[in-house]
A protein has these predicted regions:
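C-terminal-biased regions
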Residues: 1-104
Length: 104
């Protein structure tokens, strides 16, 4: 399923692969379950958004390229569900400012 996901939605595939790499297969499996359980694209995107929001603390543990993929997936979620856009924008801004402050 991971390889198929990488072809179908590369950014989400990147996030799933990285979660497995950092030994968080449980969260990767939740994302795959959201894909499998959705009968419509809205259900799939909504389920993925819920999983990523519930586990947003993992964002600090992933690589920069994967963080960019995570942001791209969340951008897709926010396009589908615009109510969360402002919240996600603020979260991304906070992360960027935090990373800049931590970079020597």
């Amino acid at each position: 399923m991971d390889a198929e996901l990488q072809r179908w939605w590369p950014d989400l595939g990147t996030v799933v692969a990285e979660l497995r790499r950092i030994d968080r297969s449980d969260v990767a499996d939740l994302l795959l379950d959201a894909v499998r359980a959705g009968a419509t694209s809205s259900e799939i995107i909504g389920g993925i958004g819920i999983v990523l929001r519930d586990h947003r603390g993992l964002y600090t543990q992933i690589s920069r390229p994967t963080a960019a993929a995570w942001d791209a997936v969340m951008a897709d979620v926010n396009r589908a569900y615009p109510v969360g856009r402002l919240s996600h924008w603020f979260t991304r801004l906070t992360r960027r400012l935090t990373r800049r402050a931590q970079t020597p």
